[in-house]
Structures are given as structure tokens and as C-alpha cells.
């Protein structure tokens, strides 16, 4: 089985170049209005578990299927901020989100980003 991971995030253990960590450390230089599918690492792990115990042999999107803007992601995590908005980024699609139909048919139900933040 092949797995296509979308924007994986976690409160701890993220790399230096990941947006969540840059926001926490104050090293992010700008934000965009691009929409991305933010999937929590716990949901990714449960998706992998579902897939390794299944007979599925294709490629699977591992994401919530819900797109939230980079700006909304930042504001939900650190509150309103003064970072500049970069309106256009070359080679970046405006919206990028998973189509998790295969995993949902297996009973996988990830928590959308904003719901995950509000539950913390």
C-alpha cells in the first residue's frame, strides 16, 4: 500500500522547518492564505494501523479531507499575530486536501484540525 501524507503536525517533536515549530519558536517569517489539510500525527498513526491490517493494495490519501488556511492554522495555535501575509507563492496550489474515502470506508475518522486544537 502507498500512503500520501498531507500536512502532518504535532505539538511535540516536529522538525525545525515545520510551521508548527516555527510558530512556537517565533521563527516564521510570513503566512499565506493557502489552504492545506492539517492532519495530526495521532490520526496518521491510526491510519497506518488501519492500512497495515487491511488487504488494500492501492495508494491512499492520509488527511482529514478538510482544508484550513495557513493563516487560520497559525491564529488557532498562537492567536492573532503580526506576521506579514504573502499573497502569492510560486508553484503552490491554493487548496491542497486529501480525499480520504478509502480510509473512511475502513472506519477511520480523523479529527479536523480546528476541533483538535479546541480539545487541547
Predicted regions and their residues:
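Residue-level signal for the nucleotide or nucleotide-sugar donor/cofactor binding architecture
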Residues: 13, 17, 36-42, 65-68, ...
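Amphipathic terminal alpha-helices
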Residues: 77, 113-120
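Short, hydrophobic alpha-helical segments
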Residues: 52-56
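Short-chain dehydrogenase/reductase
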Residues: 6-7, 59-62
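Structural element of the ATP-grasp superfamily
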Residues: 22, 102-104
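C-terminal "lid/loop" region of Rossmann-like NAD(P)-dependent oxidoreductases
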Residues: 29-33, 59-60, 68-75, 79-100
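Residue-level preference for the first positions of well-ordered beta-strands
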Residues: 1-2, 57-59
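NAD(P)-dependent short-chain dehydrogenase/reductase
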Residues: 1-37, 41-45, 49-50, 76-78
Amino acid at each position: 500500500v502507498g500512503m500520501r501524507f498531507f500536512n502532518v503536525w504535532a505539538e511535540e517533536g516536529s522538525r525545525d522547518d515545520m510551521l508548527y515549530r516555527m510558530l512556537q519558536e517565533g521563527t516564521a517569517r510570513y503566512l499565506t492564505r493557502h489552504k492545506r489539510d492539517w492532519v495530526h500525527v495521532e490520526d496518521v498513526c491510526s491510519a497506518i494501523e488501519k492500512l497495515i491490517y487491511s488487504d488494500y493494495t492501492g495508494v491512499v490519501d492520509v488527511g482529514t479531507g478538510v482544508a484550513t488556511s495557513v493563516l487560520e492554522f497559525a491564529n488557532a495555535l498562537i492567536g492573532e499575530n503580526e506576521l506579514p501575509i504573502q499573497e502569492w507563492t510560486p508553484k503552490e496550489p491554493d487548496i491542497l486536501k486529501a480525499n480520504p474515502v478509502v480510509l473512511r470506508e475502513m472506519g477511520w475518522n480523523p479529527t479536523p484540525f480546528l476541533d483538535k486544537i479546541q480539545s487541547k
